[in-house]
């Protein structure tokens, strides 16, 4: 279980905690659409408009709730699972609301500069679980016969029209889910940084994946490359300034932190033609009671995710075990 920090996008279905649950209607999206119309948004064609409202008034999905407490670090973000629809921060007069950022984080919107979440401050997060009807009906089959492009534009328009916090969070969650289901987005799509891959890394990637056909085979081969016994995890190691590159890591030092392993994996995977992204986050931390998690800096980690057709964004672990 991971709280995604910097991935764009990040797979949402891996959060399936058996915590306190409650029902919340997906008509929240329909309500957000009505608010969008009230603010001057463009009305959809009548048949689509009616289907949209009827559909989401009738579909419900279980919402899970978790209570989270960062125990030894301050933060300007409220760490949260993907598909978060609501957060509640207790006892903070300087926090007026919360907003999703373009990285899927929950960020405090404050009335003072540099406000941050202090250690041991607890907050709650409500988020959707994975529901097949919601996922396939909304994404794979399309919404009310709208094209993917039209629906994407609608979500963007709704976000940009100045929705209330509740509607904004709802629409942003749907936009994130939409983005997750499309693995062939152009390189110019917002949020995807493109990196030059050296010929040295391309040659190594080709040798690792030679003779392999399927994406999952290539991803597993690249993961196995780091687990051949020659790499070591060393939290205190620092490469020479003039050699702090992925090429030096895989070919010479073979020592580093999770960031080094994840970065090298991503470059090798991208060179092999895989759809991959680098993720930093925090695992679920120490469970205090049912639904309550304490998260410390020791729970931080970096890892890659590869999009595997039929399975979605899949976590791989190139980082080898270490003494730290």
Segments from the language model and where they lie:
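Helix-boundary/low-complexity linker signature
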Residues: 1-324
